[in-house]
């Protein structure tokens, strides 16, 4: 029962993340770089900080925790967060050229596979005494492979969509649709985004041990990863503000109330995925295979729900029933990948 509860919590977080781009559509009169930065303040600073505070027992503080933790682990966690930030920037571009459904599917699929494998591999290189590679069991690799198969099937559906639609229909569904360009960007975004889980692996012991409940133990590391990502994104957004002369966005007081609300909502929905991941892992402590695969499971469910939104937003409008069938098959495979390893 605890395993089911854990997976359900992760699924709720995935649904929230896949919905985070909906409130962004309500933001008025701001350029991309302006609203991306402000929603990032909430998604990568405010809510992760509030989450990390849950891991701090009474009489202690976050400053005490970070000061007493291994400096190498802290800086590696932040570093991989900064690399993940690059993935976040290109992630947005992948959706620009492929749409929400296909863009998230390919990027998150790559992120799921590489993120799950890179974490133990790199941790074993820096700290061989941890024997991190022992986590990569047959069941774990199988889970990753099945996830990637599901992603590949959805990718096939995307290429079928590209081949069957006229240029006018493509532009109607996704304004800047460009499958080859979008595919390359999505793969890069997925590779860099996988660094998030690497950061979590390096920071998994940054907590107060038995004084921190299992469900909150990864939240301090999540804060460090998102902090690194915020720095990367802030630098790029400020650069774009200067390049495009959009500093005036921040001076437009008439839209601040509306935009702040929807940026905060988008940030909360985005952070929900990693808050849910931490809570869900607290119920998976007796299932080591699912613990290792938890990030992969989260990404797989993100893909499932992003495609649900893609259907709702009519991004697959005009596609043949055969294309939709392939898409649904891919979604089913991804759902199966979430619990199949536990049956091995």
Please state what every model-predicted region is.
Residues 1-344:
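Polytopic alpha-helical membrane proteins, predominantly small-molecule transporters/carriers
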């Amino acid at each position: 029962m605890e395993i089911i509860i854990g997976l359900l919590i992760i699924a709720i977080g995935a649904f929230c993340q896949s919905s985070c781009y909906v409130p962004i559509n309500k933001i008025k009169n701001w350029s991309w770089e302006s609203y991306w930065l402000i929603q990032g303040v909430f998604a990568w600073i405010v809510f992760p900080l509030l989450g990390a505070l849950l891991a701090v027992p009474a009489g202690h503080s976050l400053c005490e925790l970070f000061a007493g933790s291994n400096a190498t682990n802290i800086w590696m966690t932040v570093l991989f967060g900064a690399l993940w930030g690059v993935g976040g920037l290109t992630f947005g571009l992948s959706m620009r050229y492929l749409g929400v459904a296909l863009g998230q599917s390919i990027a998150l699929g790559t992120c799921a596979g590489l993120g799950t494998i890179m974490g133990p591999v790199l941790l074993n290189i820096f700290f061989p005494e941890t024997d991190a590679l022992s986590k990569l069991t047959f069941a774990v690799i199988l889970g990753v492979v099945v996830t990637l198969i599901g992603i590949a099937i959805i990718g096939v559906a995307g290429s079928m969509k590209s081949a069957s639609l006229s240029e006018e229909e493509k532009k109607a569904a996704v304004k800047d649709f460009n499958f080859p360009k979008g595919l390359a960007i999505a793969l890069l975004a997925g590779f860099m985004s996988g660094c998030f889980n690497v950061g979590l692996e390096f920071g998994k012991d940054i907590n107060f041990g038995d004084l921190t409940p299992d469900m909150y133990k990864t939240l301090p590391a999540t804060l460090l990863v998102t902090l690194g990502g915020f720095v990367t994104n802030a630098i790029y957004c400020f650069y774009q503000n200067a390049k495009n002369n959009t500093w005036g966005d921040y001076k437009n007081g008439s839209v601040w109330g509306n935009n702040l609300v929807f940026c905060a909502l988008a940030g909360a929905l985005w952070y929900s995925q990693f808050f849910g991941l931490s809570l869900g892992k607290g119920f998976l402590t007796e299932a080591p295979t699912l613990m290792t695969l938890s990030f992969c499971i989260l990404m797989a469910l993100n893909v499932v729900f992003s495609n649900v939104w893609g259907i709702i937003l009519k991004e697959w409008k005009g596609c043949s029933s055969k294309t939709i069938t392939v898409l649904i098959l891919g979604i089913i495979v991804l759902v199966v990948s979430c619990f199949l390893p536990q049956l091995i």
